[in-house]
Regions:
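A short, N-terminal "cap"/entry segment at the start of jelly-roll beta-barrel domains
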Residues: 2-48, 95-96, 129-133
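A short beta-loop-beta micro-motif enriched in histidine and acidic residues
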Residues: 44-45, 57-72
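Sec/Tat-exported extracytoplasmic proteins
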Residues: 51, 58, 74-78, 82, ...
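Short acidic-glycine-tyrosine-enriched beta hairpin
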Residues: 54, 83-101
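Structural recognition of the beta-strand scaffold that forms the well-ordered cores
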Residues: 62, 71-72, 94-97, 117-120
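Short beta-strand His + acidic residue motifs that chelate non-heme Fe in jelly-roll/DSBH
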Residues: 62, 80-81, 97, 103-110
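Glycine- and acidic-residue-biased ligand/ion/polar-headgroup-sensing regions
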Residues: 66-84, 93
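Ligand-binding loop in jelly-roll beta-barrel domains
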Residues: 101-126
Length: 133
């Protein structure tokens, strides 16, 4: 009986984790965190370095951050915002998104995935993403 109950609880936890990962409340599945550290001059802030790979047909939902995000395009691709013509986000270009300013919402429409290196300087202890509805 205990084994069955443990298995049931484990299954429910796995299901909840899967649902959480598939909803905007969680992290982006395309993002791989490389490093995270406290900002030495401001202990209530942290620096997060990540690589993201967004495949053809994948969409990054509109969101903002509790701090600044800066990035570099490692591999460019054609992207499209809703209601707009496709545009090239070129390899070697950079970007910066300011605190609490919604951005993204694009879909990769080119033949190759888009690869980004991002650095976030954000409020420590808060979620990295604030999803825009």
């Amino acid at each position: 009986m205990r084994a069955a109950r443990s298995l049931a609880i484990t299954s429910i936890c796995a299901l909840i984790a899967t649902v959480w990962a598939d909803t905007p409340q969680g992290d982006l599945p395309q993002r791989r965190e490389l490093q995270r550290a406290a900002l030495t001059t401001s202990p209530d802030m942290e620096v997060i370095t990540s690589i993201s790979e967004i495949g053809k047909g994948e969409t990054i939902p509109r969101h903002s951050h509790h701090g600044i995000e800066t990035g570099y395009v490692l591999q460019g691709s054609m992207v499209q915002l809703p209601g707009q013509a496709p545009t090239m986000m070129a390899t070697g270009s950079s970007f910066m998104n300011l605190r609490d300013v919604p951005h993204a919402g694009f879909t990769v429409v080119g033949d190759q995935p888009q690869k980004l290196l991002t650095v976030h300087v954000v409020d420590r202890g808060k979620p990295l993403y604030a999803w825009v509805k």
